[in-house]
Amino acid sequence: MSLARPTSIIPADQNRNLLGELRVRHPSWYYWTFAYTVLTVICLAAGLIDERNFQGVSVWDKPFKFALSIAVYFATLGWFANLMQPDYFNTLRGKLLTGVPVVCALLEMLYILVQGARGEPSHFNVSSPFYSVMYGLMGAGAALMVATCLWMGCSILRNRGTNDIWVLSVGIGLIGTFVLGGGVGFYLGGAEAHWVSGETTDAGGLPLVNWSRTGGDLRVAHFFGIHAMQVIPCVGALLVWLRQRNRIGHLGAQVCLTSVSLGFAAFCISTFIQALRGAPFI
């Protein structure tokens, strides 16, 4: 296996920064990353100005978190885009792969923004036929977004094989997001709330994430699951770095990546079981 610098991880043009490289790899997802980053800042500012609360936290807390999460989502997909087949995104399938998550994220974000601005819940809100339909559509959109990860992960592994550590880590991470994040998300969609026992408020939760400290919280497992697409490739990038410096062999890197991936999956499942038992994460 060549120890040459892997251009799939770093910019191919050393005169180009990371944002410039992302723009080259997938322009559409780059611009949506930028748009949701701006929206994240706007929601953060709105939360500082607007003193209204819902379930113990700012009404802008959920829009802020979702805008940030979607920005990271598109940045990640865009960074992996160069592992797809050449000109794949110019085909009908490629255009669908680009457009489906964009439309789903946009519609979901708009609804979350509107509900947040009104001080009304977007998730678990089935108080009227309209809200029930909207909640169902949000779930369908989220399912399509994680299905995009599955589609892309399988395509990358089929196109590039599993011998390259970086490629393998990307494939595992994307598929892991579908399995772990999507699996917990599916369960969440059928639940009445993200709390299991404990106080039904986000007030007093863990800093930044607001996870319950008085009972179980299903958002914990969902959070870690959907971020498999970042965690596992980061491990892969570290292993590539070690390979370049002859500090680990190819077989050792594969074993390490497999072990970490299985361990991460076990961790996500354990946090899910922990929440179901009504126990707080910390």
Where would I find each of the regions flagged by the language model?
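Cytoplasmic juxtamembrane interface segments
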Residues: 4-9, 71-86, 151-168, 191-200
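Cytoplasmic juxtamembrane regions at transmembrane-helix boundaries
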Residues: 90-97, 161-178, 240-264
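Membrane-interfacial catalytic/cofactor-binding modules of polytopic membrane enzymes
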Residues: 188-228
